[in-house]
């Protein structure tokens, strides 16, 4: 396990700061705001639950982000146990190439109640562009790099040539390839089942985050798991 505090990450924008305060407030080191009153107005409109936390840490200063809010936080302790045992699907991205798409997939995983988000390949899951794409929701679930050999549980690999998409078991590993390269040969060989999302004839692929979203919400809507402490319905942003 990595020690928190060895790596500091930048929280770009109000939503990233909001999610860090909501899910890991003890890790937030600093919040810089262009205007305290404007930042509090954002809290009142979008996240009243973090208002007092933001007020306690906010210091006025220059901010480049258009929301007028940015911050710094310690990277959380790395929880690798989710690779071996889980009560909700683990999203495993097979060598993603686009940091923003990987971040968007992590954002969906957090929203849908996945147990974690893991990346195969060379992309750092905590790269600033990945964190930006996830709107700071790295603090809501374990996010890490791993190898195929570390992963246990039934592996469901999404591929256009797979069998019709089934209901995912709660301990599933949902593997999604990159838009350009798809799934690697090693991943396909490791998969217990290769499955496909139903799509209109002539449509061959989906955006990475869209595919993750469709699969995870099919799992949720199937009633296989009753999520605890849901925050409610989605709000844009």
Spell out what each predicted region is.
Residues 49, 75-162, 221, 232-234:
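RNA substrate-binding interface of SAM-dependent RNA methyltransferases
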Residues 13, 97-105, 204-211:
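Amphipathic alpha-helical repeat scaffolds
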Residues 35-43, 125-127, 163-165:
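Short, charged/polar "capping" segments at the starts of alpha-helices
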Residues 10-11, 29-34, 143-145, 154-160, ...:
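Short, hydrophobic beta-strand segments that form beta-sheet elements in well-ordered domains
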Residues 1-69, 227-237:
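N-terminal positively charged helical leader segments and presequences
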Residues 71, 108-112, 122-125, 129-138, ...:
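Structured adenosyl-cofactor binding patch, chiefly the S-adenosyl-L-methionine
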Residues 157-207:
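Active-site/ligand-binding-proximal alpha/beta "capping" segment
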């Amino acid at each position: 396990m990595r020690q928190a505090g060895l790596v500091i990450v930048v929280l770009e924008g109000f939503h990233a700061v909001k999610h860090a305060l909501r899910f890991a407030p003890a890790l937030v080191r600093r919040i810089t705001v262009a205007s305290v009153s404007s930042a509090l107005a954002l809290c009142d409109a979008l996240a009243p639950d973090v208002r007092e936390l933001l007020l306690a840490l906010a210091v006025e200063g220059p901010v480049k982000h258009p929301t007028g809010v940015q911050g710094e936080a310690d990277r959380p302790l790395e929880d690798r146990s989710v690779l071996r045992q889980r009560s909700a699907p683990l999203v495993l991205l097979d060598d993603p190439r686009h940091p923003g798409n990987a971040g968007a997939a992590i954002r969906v995983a957090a929203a849908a109640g996945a147990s974690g988000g893991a990346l195969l390949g060379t992309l750092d899951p905590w790269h600033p562009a990945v964190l930006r794409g996830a709107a700071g929701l790295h603090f809501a679930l374990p996010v890490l790099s791993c190898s195929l050999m570390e992963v246990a549980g039934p592996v469901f690999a999404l591929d256009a040539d797979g069998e019709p998409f089934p209901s995912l078991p709660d301990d599933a590993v949902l593997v999604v390839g990159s838009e350009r390269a798809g799934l690697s040969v090693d991943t396909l060989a490791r998969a217990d089942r290769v499955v496909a999302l139903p799509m209109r004839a002539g449509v061959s692929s989906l955006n990475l985050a869209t595919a993750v979203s469709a699969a995870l919400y099919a799992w949720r809507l199937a009633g296989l798991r009753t999520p605890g402490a849901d925050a409610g319905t989605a709000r844009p942003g």
